[in-house]
Amino acid sequence: MAGAAARRETRPMPTFVIRLTAPRPSFAMDMTDEEREVMGRHAAHWGSFIEAGRMVVFGPVLDGQGSWGLGVLEADAEDEIKAHAAEDPVVTTGTGTIEVGTLLTGFVRP
């Protein structure tokens, strides 16, 4: 039961979910060179969260409708994530949009 108890422990920071909506469902498979460059800058933009160990998962998701981007990360406040998302090259270039949500509760493996 120690493993189950550990999974029930609260996270040290709130957890947030970001969803990137691309300009078309096939975006992950058929990016132009310009879009690929923007996506490289997008990944670098979130690098500080990855390097700090605050990004739980980050990358494209394929489903029956196409693709979209997912990030699950820890931060002090939702405003921090919203401000960072607003400066994302995907958003500033109009390549896509980013939505931010708060994970209210759940389980995270240790």
Residue spans of the language-model regions?
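Conserved, structured core segments of small domains
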Residues: A2-P110
